[in-house]
């Protein structure tokens, strides 16, 4: 059971006469001990207390004392003159300092606290009005943009229809990397035989009145027309070197179609006929009494080992081994037209050049020309 203290007595005791008598006696004793002391609310009789307040007020007063009720303030009613003075000050500044508020309070006959609260409420009202104006402006802008956007939507719609009806052509951007790589490989493979032909033509131009036969010319365009196909079954995967010496990235073949044994033999036979005619022309024009010119022509022939890799490192090793064996078998036929028998009385240096060295030089020249006709580029050592 809860007890609500009233000077040490419970509320239930107030219902009895003895409780009221004790309260009255206690109040009388306090008044006697302190004559100048005002008697408290508890010293009043129950009839006096009930006459001025309700039972709920008695309970609240017993619980919290006589000052339990919150003092309520009535709403301040500003006059027209007070509102005019306050509005003029608000137009000058929204945050008046203490001095300005005190002067305004003296002019309007209002407490300074009321002036301060009025400015606080006035600032809140001003911010609310500003927000409403901003919302209205945004709404108007959206409506204006919507009206303009409706007119613009029709024009882009027709443009998109034209774009969809137009067939998709080649992409305007850069070509794919695979296409660029294949084009670069093809250009490199086509430029390599051309550079080889230029070097051969320069070396042949140094020889007196050397002519190129039509048989050897007919081989090279066929090789240049072929595009590199790395996935062809019979092609030879060789990484050619550019004239500057840099190796290409992916390995690709030098021929577009597989090289059959019959085709190799036919090309070699035609090419040998062309080179034999060339050698015969040079030997006839040099003549018998001038073997030194023939030796110079043989010396002018480029050495195969300078620009070509060893035959053992090539993929067509067996073919070149058979080629060298055939060249050794026909050593006398190939070596006789280039250098005739030197007459007696020549210098010892020209006599020391025997037929074996001449056959090796001829073999290197023919192997190099045959590789150029097939489109095989030179490889560094």
Swiss-Prot record:
Expressed in adult brain, stomach, and testis. Expressed in the developing diencephalon, midbrain and hindbrain. During limb development, expressed in a temporal pattern with expression being first restricted to the forelimbs and then subsequently to the hindlimbs. Keywords: Developmental protein, DNA-binding, Homeobox, Nucleus, Repressor, Transcription, Transcription regulation. Residues 1-156 are annotated as: Interaction with OTX2 and is required for repressor activity. A motif (OAR) lies at residues 358-371. Pfam families: Homeodomain, OAR. SUPFAM superfamilies: Homeodomain-like. Residues 71-130 bind DNA. Residues 177-191 have a biased composition (Low complexity). Residues 133-153, 201-214 have a biased composition (Basic and acidic residues). GO terms for biological process: adult feeding behavior; adult locomotory behavior; brain development; central nervous system development; developmental growth; negative regulation of DNA-templated transcription; negative regulation of transcription by RNA polymerase II. One of its GO terms (molecular function) is DNA-binding transcription repressor activity, RNA polymerase II-specific. It is found in: Nucleus. The keyword Transmembrane helix does not apply. SMART domains: HOX. Residues 129-250 are annotated as: Disordered. PANTHER family: DIENCEPHALON/MESENCEPHALON HOMEOBOX PROTEIN 1, DIENCEPHALON_MESENCEPHALON HOMEOBOX PROTEIN 1. Functions as a transcriptional repressor. May repress OTX2-mediated transactivation by forming a heterodimer with OTX2 on the P3C (5'-TAATCCGATTA-3') sequence. Required for brain development, neonatal survival, postnatal growth, and nursing ability. Belongs to the paired homeobox family. This is Diencephalon/mesencephalon homeobox protein 1. It comes from Mus musculus. The gene is Dmbx1.
